[in-house]
Every structure is written in structure tokens, then in C-alpha cells.
UniProtKB/Swiss-Prot annotation:
Pfam families associated with the record: RadC (PF04002), UPF0758_N (PF20582)
Name assigned to this protein: UPF0758 protein NMCC_1157
PROSITE patterns, per database record: MPN
Gene Ontology terms for molecular function: metal ion binding; metallopeptidase activity
Protein family according to the UniProt entry: Belongs to the UPF0758 family.
Chain span(s) of sequence motif JAMM motif: 173-186
Naturally occurring in which organism (per UniProt): Neisseria meningitidis serogroup C (strain 053442)
Binding site for Zn(2+): 173, 175, 186
Amino acid sequence: MSIKQWPEGERPREKLLERGAAALSDAELLAILLRVGTRGMSAVDLARYLLQEFGSLGRLMSAEVGKLSAYKGMGTASFTQFAVVREIGRRILAEELQESIVLSDPDTVADYLRFHLGQEKVEVSVALLLNRQNQLIAVRELSRGTVAENTIYIREIVKLALDEYADSLIIAHNHPGGSPEPSQEDIMFTRRLAQAMSLVDVSLLDHFIVTAQTVRSFRQLGLMP
């Protein structure tokens, strides 16, 4: 049965208009994006199937175009739609973060980092640069791919903080393998970076490790120098 044949109150679009987006399931929200299903499957049926195949909404929305195109009814159009939704969400979170007092709202930082880094397939490091009021100045990508900790890399972070006139910063990186626990290398790098930042009167406030499901704070773990 196509969605047009459903009772009006159960159709995703009508349900959204009547009850709000929060009342819709993941499959119903996704069906609105997909707009149409495939032969023998409504848009909601296709959405449910894809969610089951990928395991979560986040994994589906972050799937590479080649993997997505392997499923009937999906292709570059769906990939670009998903990419746009992800980027809009990331920018909204960035705006909220920039308007907030970062240290009084750590959940906003964690939400932003999870959205920004949680689905990355390679290790990505970022710096959140803050002013004296602990407000966000900028978010800058530091590296993409595994980067060995070295003096030049630390110098680049110090230079970035000085160029942006930051009074403090938070760094974060993801663990694509899924474990949020800091490695010994992560701990040693954080100590060296904190020492380097102190020489230019910039404080390293925290270091976050991000996975798709979890965000770990070095400060909360008692690991900050």
C-alpha cells in the first residue's frame, strides 16, 4: 500500500504538520527526505529497510555514495540530500555553540563534537578557540588521518591560537575504531601541548575524544595536566 492510501493522520508529512517533527519515528522522518519508495516498497518501508541495513540513522546519513548506491532506489541524489542535511545540522550546532558560554554548557560542546566528528571514517583533530569570556571564536581542523605527535604539529597549534588571538582552547579528535578511551599517546600529547600553550599564556582547557556514541573529556577523567 502506498503512503497516499494511508489514513491522513498516519502519513508522515501530515503527521509532522499536526504533531510536530519530534512525533515522527526515524523511518518517518527519513521517508519525508526520500519522498518516494521503490517497486513494492513505500518510502517508509524503504526507510525502515535502510535503517535496518545500516544499523542507525547516523551511519546511514554518513554513508559514502558508492555504498549508498548499492541499494535500489538510492544514488547520488539521496547522497547529496543526506550531505546537505548533515551540513545544515553541523552549522546550526556551530551557531549555537558560538552563541553560548562554552564552559557553562559542556553538553553543547559534546553534541557538536559528536555530530562533527562521530561519523568520520579517519581520525580528525580539531581545535575550539575561545576568548577571555570562554566564548567560541572559531573551530579549526588541525589534521585528517593519523598524525604522529611531534614538535612541529604542536607549534602549528600554538601558532593557530596566537593568530586567532585565543585566550584558551579545547582540542578534540575522534577514534574511528569506536573505543573512546584515551591512549597513552593521547595523554602524553595533551601534556606536551598544555606545556607549550602555557609558554604563550594560552590555556588548554580540555581534550575530548569522540566516537559515534560517546564523548570523553580528559578533564572529567582527571587527565588534564
